[in-house]
Amino acid sequence: MRTPRFRVQAKNVFLTYPNCSIPKEHLLSFIQTLSLPSNPKFIKICRELHQNGEPHLHALIQFEGKITITNNRLFDCVHPSCSTNFHPNIQGAKSSSDVKSYLDKDGDTVEWGQFQIDGRSARGGQQSANDAYAKALNSGSKSEALNVIRELVPKDFVLQFHNLNSNLDRIFQEPPAPYVSPFPCSSFDQVPDELEEWVADNVRDSAARPWRPNSIVIEGDSRTGKTIWARSLGPHNYLCGHLDLSPKVFNNDAWYNVIDDVDPHYLKHFKEFMGSQRDWQSNTKYGKPVQIKGGIPTIFLCNPGPTSSYKEFLDEEKQEALKAWALKNAIFITLTEPLYSGSNQSQSQTIQEASHPA
């Protein structure tokens, strides 16, 4: 009887080298140097130990186009140390996603190129999608989760990308990086007693903080050290020029807020901030409402003038009721001198110019 001629036609090829001690990095280099009918787009090598301790190597190769293999010795590889020849089993891979998942299960892998999504899975069905999303949630980061969904559930990746992107932002939300003050608090050696007392009473962690702490409005000329001092007191949210309450900027676990150079005429959530109110929502222009835990004081920083000063704003005739409320929820201080002495002036001014001129 005539022996069937060896022939494999496929765009994706799966190789298995049984009882193979070749380093996986060497096999990857070997495949990259082969003269093949089509250029590889992606190669992944996996080293797997069977129960008897013998190593096997598996390889997935994705090509630009379908290839025909008639030489069953095409992928034979010689061990770099002992000249032993290793011959693989060669077969077409119906689902690259399933093969890649199999290679990834033990984690001892090396790869080259960009994995090509094929959208075919032998498992299929709802359970496969559930498994893919479970793997995405366990991936540890938004970018890794998106890669998992792109590979395993490409239809959802294309059709639901906007929702996925938004949901994963919230799931893998990272608090803003903590601010590091360029000066220790001791650099500010001309802080009025009233300011020091306010800090001692209101800028505390959640366990020691009053239930409804008082806020403070600090008005003064530029380069008096207001911003640097206010930001040196502890973990805080810094909102300058406009309010951004997105999780990327605003941290619900901060001890206090600093609102710097925001015209009080256009300050959204005036009472929520000044009154240290708890559990309130902010509607965003292009997203879902943001839930603010609140209950922390706010330092309002401003310069004199009709579009900056909170005092001038509250002295307007139409703000009479708001002024009466504000005086019960905040103290107002006007600085006439810098918060630092002459010995600290040069360094403080340099940092102030680099950060914010208020």
Curated annotation (Swiss-Prot):
Motif (RCR-2): 56-58
The EC number(s) this enzyme carries: 2.7.7.-, 3.1.21.-
Location of region: Oligomerization: 155-175
Subcellular location: Host nucleus
Positions of short motif RCR-3: 102-105
PROSITE patterns for the chain: CRESS_DNA_REP
Record protein name field: Replication-associated protein
Keyword tags: ATP-binding, Covalent protein-DNA linkage, DNA replication, DNA-binding, Endonuclease, Helicase, Host nucleus, Host-virus interaction, Hydrolase, Metal-binding, Multifunctional enzyme, Nuclease, Nucleotide-binding, Nucleotidyltransferase, Transferase
Top-rank taxon: Viruses
